[in-house]
Design a protein with these regions (language model features):
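Short secondary-structure boundary/capping segments
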Residues: 1, 9, 25, 84, ...
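Short loop segments at secondary-structure junctions
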Residues: 13-16, 23, 95-100, 115-117
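Active-site segment of metal-dependent pyrophosphate-handling enzymes
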Residues: 60-100
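NUDIX/MutT-family hydrolases
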Residues: 91-93, 102-132
Length: 135
């Protein structure tokens, strides 16, 4: 069995949450909606520091513009794309004071939605569970 450690961050602005549509240029889960996510690249890196790096890279928010509201213990989900592969997901909830973001190439669209509306979007696996566990 192979394991990959990843972070998934939900970003909240007032009562809305940010969803990102993964572009067709990414390696996995193309054209589905997600939070801000990324692989923890080495054992010396903490999940929180990786989450902040991914937020800056994917939506252009520097650390002083985000506030950590909550983190949960990791969850494991089996990969839908790779056999004998498990994703260890470290979930975070951040808050921002402004809805202004700048997408990079990893995502093609973004929306701010009411959390309950997530059921209307095709998302990466476990995103709904992660979201409602954090809220």
């Amino acid at each position: 069995m192979r394991y990959t450690n990843i972070v998934t961050s939900i970003i909240k602005y007032q009562e809305k949450i940010l969803l990102l549509k993964r572009s067709n240029k990414v390696k996995t889960m193309k054209n589905v909606w997600s939070g801000v996510s990324g692989i923890i690249e080495n054992d010396d890196e903490s999940p929180l520091s990786r989450a902040k790096i991914e937020i800056f890279e994917e939506v252009g928010l520097v650390e002083k513009k985000i506030e950590l509201l909550k983190s949960n213990k990791q969850i494991e989900i089996d990969s839908q794309q790779y056999k004998n592969h498990t994703w260890n997901i470290f979930p975070f909830l951040f808050q921002v004071e402004t809805p202004e973001i700048k997408l990079n190439w990893e995502n093609s669209e973004f929306v701010w939605i009411d959390p309950n509306d997530i059921v209307n979007y095709k998302t990466v696996p476990a995103l709904k569970q992660i979201l409602f566990d954090l809220l």
